[in-house]
């Protein structure tokens, strides 16, 4: 089995967007997710979901969670993904938040 560590970061918008998708013929372990409010004076709300391709379903694991200005919300427990599964994120408004994740891809 070949393992590859990957990082992915994006600027969040008010539209749910796919941040990461597990490639075909691989499995992924999301080691950590960092959701950061990059403003100094605006509260932001963030949502995160996992799309399970085999179930044809999005599962919300975070829904409109408050992130104070200059703060970071961290998921530090693993999220296991099968081939084609994805992580989706959105914020309450554009230009308020960034998201970063650390992934181990296993083939």
Annotate each predicted stretch with a short phrase.
Residues 51-55, 106-107:
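Short edge-strand/loop segments of extracellular domains
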Residues 35-41, 92:
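Short solvent-exposed strand-capping/beta-turn motif centered on an Asx-Ser/Thr pair
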Residues 53-86:
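Intrinsically disordered, low-complexity Pro/Gly/Ser/Thr-rich segments with frequent PxxP/GP/PP motifs
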Residues 27-29, 41-45, 57, 96-97:
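Short acidic/proline- and small/hydrophobic-mixed sequence motifs that coincide with surface turns
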Residues 1-28, 32, 90-107:
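C-terminal interaction-tip segments
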Residues 29-34, 47, 72-74:
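Ordered hydrophobic segments in well-structured contexts
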Residues 47-51, 100-102:
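Beta-strand signatures of extracellular beta-sandwich domains
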Residues 46-48, 87-89:
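Hydrophobic beta-strand residues in large extracellular and virion-surface proteins
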